[in-house]
């Protein structure tokens, strides 16, 4: 079963999207989380919204601007560090599954930066580490919810559901595809892992079923850092495909309540990953 992560009604929540093997950005968000753990006496949480793995293998001279800041894929080391961090902070470090992780445990294999990114990463890891990675990924839930009204998915909230039980009962394994595009026909799992947009009415029905008011997700790249869609949806780009100056993460008050995504304010809930590089329009210190 896919499962749902239920966050508490107290503390701070740091939200990071789409690292895709960028270890430098992972280390930066972890340092932010650790600072909040110290400031709150341990009442902080860190949530990754999927796609921690599968980055580019491109030389600097061939790097295109549309991929944002240059980096080299370090998916294996990133996942090892995530596992150690989660073990050191039980019930405080979380991740939900993204479409790139899903490929390792039954989903279609992605081919963004290689003919088969699943095969490439697993060949680099070797048999033992591959078995370890698959076991880790099978533990990840499909969605996360919080009493503050936030519902977290990897892709857009485009699953047309009537109850939270439909998400809880969704299967991530045992799927068979004649073509990778067949995933779009899989109820619940297909749209929540692959959709880049959701019609307003579908998003509202999804949020009602999940008991939330706002949907927070990544998956798509927003070069400006984030995009609000109506009152219910916000797409956040913390890492992949974005230059350092525009990378943002979220800092939420789990004891609060967010009625619309416009309750998420730049410089408060919406924060720059690298403040010294970010413009003031994103809450940064640069001119």
Regions found by a protein language model. Give the residues of each.
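Beta-strand-turn-beta hairpins that frame and shape the catalytic cleft
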Residues: 5-14, 145-151, 231
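A short C-terminal boundary segment appended to hydrolase-like catalytic domains
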Residues: 268-287
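Active-site neighborhood of phospho(di)ester-bond hydrolases with catalytic His/Asp-centered motifs
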Residues: 15-17, 46-51, 94-99, 152-153, ...
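Conserved beta-sheet core of the metallophosphoesterase superfamily
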Residues: 111, 116-123, 197-258
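Active-site neighborhood of divalent metal-dependent phosphoester bond hydrolases
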Residues: 42-43, 52-150, 158
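Active-site environment of divalent metal-dependent phosphoester hydrolases
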Residues: 22-24, 54-57, 100-106, 158-160, ...
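N-terminal active-site segment of His-dependent metallophosphoesterases
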Residues: 1-73
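Active-site-proximal loop/helix segment associated with metal-binding centers of metalloenzymes
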Residues: 111-129, 134-210, 243
């Amino acid at each position: 079963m896919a499962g749902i992560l239920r966050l508490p009604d107290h503390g701070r929540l740091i939200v990071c999207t789409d690292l895709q093997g960028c270890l430098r950005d992972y280390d930066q968000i972890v340092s932010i989380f650790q600072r909040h753990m110290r400031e709150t006496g341990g009442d902080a949480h860190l949530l990754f919204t999927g796609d921690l793995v599968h980055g580019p293998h491109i030389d600097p001279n061939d790097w295109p601007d549309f991929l944002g800041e240059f980096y080299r894929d370090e998916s294996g080391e990133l996942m090892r560090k995530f596992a150690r961090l989660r073990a050191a902070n039980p019930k405080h470090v979380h991740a939900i599954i993204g479409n790139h992780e899903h490929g390792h445990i039954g989903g279609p294999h992605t081919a963004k930066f290689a003919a088969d990114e699943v095969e490439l990463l697993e060949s680099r890891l070797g048999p033992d580490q591959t078995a370890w990675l698959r076991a880790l990924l099978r533990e990840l839930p499909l969605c996360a919810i919080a009493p503050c009204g936030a519902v977290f998915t990897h892709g857009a909230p485009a699953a047309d559901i009537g109850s939270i039980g439909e998400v809880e009962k969704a299967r991530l394994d045992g799927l068979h595809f004649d073509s990778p595009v067949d995933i779009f026909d899989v109820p619940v799992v297909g749209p929540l892992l692959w959709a880049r947009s959701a019609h307003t009415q579908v998003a509202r029905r999804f949020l009602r079923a999940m008991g939330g008011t706002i949907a927070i997700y990544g998956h798509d790249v927003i070069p400006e850092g984030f995009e609000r869609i109506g009152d219910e949806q916000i797409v956040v780009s913390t890492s992949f495909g974005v230059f350092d100056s525009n990378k943002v993460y979220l800092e939420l008050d789990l004891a609060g309540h967010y009625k619309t995504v416009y309750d998420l304010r730049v410089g408060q809930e919406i924060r720059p990953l690298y403040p010294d590089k970010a413009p003031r329009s994103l809450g940064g210190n640069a001119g």
